[in-house]
């Protein structure tokens, strides 16, 4: 195969991958789900940074956190463009966004940890995109299945699923499939200033951040 045909075939494959979305939903499911409040918090967990070091989420005490499982080659990837403006508008600096790359949905995050930031800057969303100082991108992890990260196991236990249907089996790169699984890339969990998960949002429940902003404001007003 010539180099030109090889490049073309890779481009076609990439377009097919990017075009894959999770299951379509009706408007009745776009309302965020409220989480069960318990004594356990996200501060009990550690996560891996891009350099391989571990970081305790207790370092985010007294912050409102938006936790997002992200992917570079997803139809929802352009939501990255909304993250920085939302953080810029958060004048008191209370809000932090924590992004966790995951490759479990149609293999839409194939990059290694050391490649992730370059992929975001030069490929998708591209155009020199770099994260705001309060946008933190961590190492890749699994959000579902046998090896789901303890943080995500906790979030799923505390917050009901956003939709009643998980999706198509061939698009989900994990086992076993659970009823409370993260549905697709860019699902979001909103955590209050005490580290308690409060709301869970479907990836489509976004609208350039306007669908989530009222709930962020609500948690920021809390003492």
Swiss-Prot record:
Belongs to the glutathione peroxidase family. It comes from Brugia malayi. One of its GO terms (cellular component) is extracellular region. Glycans are attached at residues 39, 92. Could inhibit the oxidative burst of leukocytes and neutralize the secondary products of lipid peroxidation, thus providing the resistance of these parasites to immune effector mechanisms and their persistence in the mammalian host. It may also be involved in the formation of cross-linking residues such as dityrosine, trityrosine and isotrityrosine identified in cuticular collagen. Highly cross-linked external cortex may also serve to protect the parasite from immune attack. Homotetramer. The active site is at residue 74. This is Cuticular glutathione peroxidase. Gene3D superfamilies: Glutaredoxin (3.40.30.10). It is found in: Secreted.
